[in-house]
Amino acid sequence: MTNKNTGKDIRQNSPKEHQSGQPEPLSGSKKVKNRNHTRQKHNSHHDM
């Protein structure tokens, strides 16, 4: 009983934390990097 409960608890906690932590930082980092790069290039040209 203890072994089954521990396995289920860890399994349910793993996907929940991974799903909430992986897509957020990955999407945010990619979106921010892409947006920052395009904005900086555009801003640099306009500023200069």
Curated annotation (Swiss-Prot):
Induction: Expressed only in the forespore compartment of sporulating cells. The keyword Transcription does not apply. Transmembrane segments: none annotated. It comes from the Bacteria. Residues 30-48 have a biased composition (Basic residues). Residues 1-48 are annotated as: Disordered. GO terms for biological process: asexual sporulation; sporulation resulting in formation of a cellular spore. The keyword Thylakoid does not apply. Residues 1-19 have a biased composition (Basic and acidic residues). Keywords: Sporulation. It is found in: Spore core. Belongs to the SspP family. NCBIfam families: PRK09399.1. This is Small, acid-soluble spore protein P. The lineage of its organism: Bacteria, Bacillati, Bacillota, Bacilli, Bacillales.
